[in-house]
Amino acid sequence: CGSRAGKMEQHNSGKPFVKQKKCVGCHSCAKICAHGAPTFGPDKKATIDTDKCVGCARCLAICPTDAIQCMYDEAPSILNKKIAEYTKAVVQGRPCFHVSLVMDVSPNCDCHSENDVPIVPNVGMFASFDPVALDQACIDAVLAQPKMPNSAIGSGEACQCEDHFKAAHPDTDWEAALIHSEKIGLGSREYKLVKI
């Protein structure tokens, strides 16, 4: 729920860098970047021009060797807090009813065209007047599902942790958004699930 400029601001603290030893010079990052931020030197290794980079992290998601990393450890949690703040700005003082379809849960943000198969089976539809309770219920439902075989987290290479989101992205901190959402008064993580 942010404009293009707003999304750049949300991602701003998460600008990536390249671990040179891991870069194989495949140019995947350059092909997917709409801003021309990745460049290649004589050693054929990528570097990210942070002045051109908008922090969308598409290069991070597509890198086949995980050579591209977030620059700051706190970046994912800061991004999640900013998302909560943008959400509050949109819904504050307005009557809202929120609906989430927990289907085709992909390992990456659904804005990435290179996404993989779903990581868990389809769960269903959830609805609430409280967006925080809704998100918590959806997360709990996803975490209760078995991992899909042949998905990014179903293979033996993924983290074998209980948290499917951390299995897909070990450095993620999805809970920061919900904690911050409660703190700023967006809603409550407590919910009562009524199945219809």
Regions found by a protein language model. Give the residues of each.
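Extended, low-polarity segments enriched in aliphatic/aromatic residues
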Residues: 1-196
